[in-house]
């Protein structure tokens, strides 16, 4: 009898402070500490990211820059640079080829690595994660890592600091996760909550045809990608270096 194929293992590298750190990568930790002037990254005159000290003043993401200056006279505003962020992700992806040939960009702050075949070479998942975190921190960036059996579950795990439950399927590992953390459309979450559905376990227990009728094909496809029922076609794993 053939042994059942082992599921692939995906590691998501999330860089929540990338918009700030691309300007001062070698001073990232200092810049985010509370002993420097408050710094905000703005786009179209709205705050998109805040340093630690800026956030401590009560400023929030989405605040208009003009209003922010009134609340914090010492605020330093820097225009967002999508090109710097893109180049930084490209550079980081190149460095990550040290650990796996399967590296892909996943949005503006994430990189996805398929690490199933890397575990033995790097003495297990914990050691591999440590090496990646050490490498990225040394480069001047603040990493958060999530690991799961699907790219989407790994991404969500990284963003919410979910413990590694990679030996379980996402439907089991994330079963207690609140719907608000699944990155579903807000109207869908509101409608589900009115039905008494607030966590992933309750959601996946509902008949698929009922969900499709109420929320549409796109909703079902997203849920199946999260759970691993279908492959994630939007994620391309290059066979040549990330450029």
Place the predicted regions along the sequence by residue:
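DNA-contacting surface of Y-family translesion DNA polymerases
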Residues: 10-12, 28, 72-75, 189, ...
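Long, highly charged, low-complexity intrinsically disordered interaction regions
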Residues: 152-175
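Extended compositionally biased segments used for macromolecular assembly or nucleic-acid engagement
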Residues: 144-155, 172, 181-184
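Residues that scaffold, gate, or flank divalent-cation-dependent active/transport sites
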Residues: 1-112, 117-119, 126-134, 143-147, ...
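Short, structured patches in soluble enzyme cores that scaffold and shape functional sites
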Residues: 115-117, 147-149, 186-188, 196, ...
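Single conserved hydrophobic/aromatic residue that forms the stacking wall/gate
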Residues: 234-243
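C-terminal extensions
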Residues: 175-185, 229-235
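Short, charged/polar, Gly/Pro-enriched secondary-structure boundary elements
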Residues: 118-123, 163-165
């Amino acid at each position: 009898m053939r042994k059942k194929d082992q599921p692939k293992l995906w590691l998501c590298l999330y860089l929540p402070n990338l918009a700030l750190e691309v300007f001062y990568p070698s001073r990232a930790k200092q810049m985010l500490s509370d002993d420097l002037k408050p710094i905000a990254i703005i786009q179209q005159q709205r705050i998109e990211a805040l340093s630690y000290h800026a956030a401590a003043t009560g400023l929030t993401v989405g605040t208009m820059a003009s209003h922010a200056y009134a609340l914090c006279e010492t605020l330093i505003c820097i225009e967002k640079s999508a090109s710097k962020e893109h180049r930084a992700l490209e550079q980081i992806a190149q460095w990550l080829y040290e650990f796996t040939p399967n590296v892909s960009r996943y949005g503006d702050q994430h990189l996805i690595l398929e690490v199933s075949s890397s575990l033995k070479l790097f003495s297990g998942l914990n050691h591999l994660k440590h090496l990646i975190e050490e490498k990225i921190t040394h480069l001047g960036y603040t990493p958060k890592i999530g690991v799961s059996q699907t790219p989407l579950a790994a991404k969500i795990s990284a963003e919410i600091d979910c413990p590694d439950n990679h030996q379980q399927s996402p439907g089991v590992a994330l079963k207690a996760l609140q719907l608000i953390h699944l990155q579903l459309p807000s109207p869908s979450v509101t409608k589900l909550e009115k039905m008494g559905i607030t966590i992933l376990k309750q959601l996946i227990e509902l008949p698929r045809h009922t969900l499709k009728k109420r929320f549409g094909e796109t909703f079902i496809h997203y849920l199946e990608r999260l759970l691993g029922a279908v492959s994630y076609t939007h994620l391309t794993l290059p066979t040549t270096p990330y450029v």
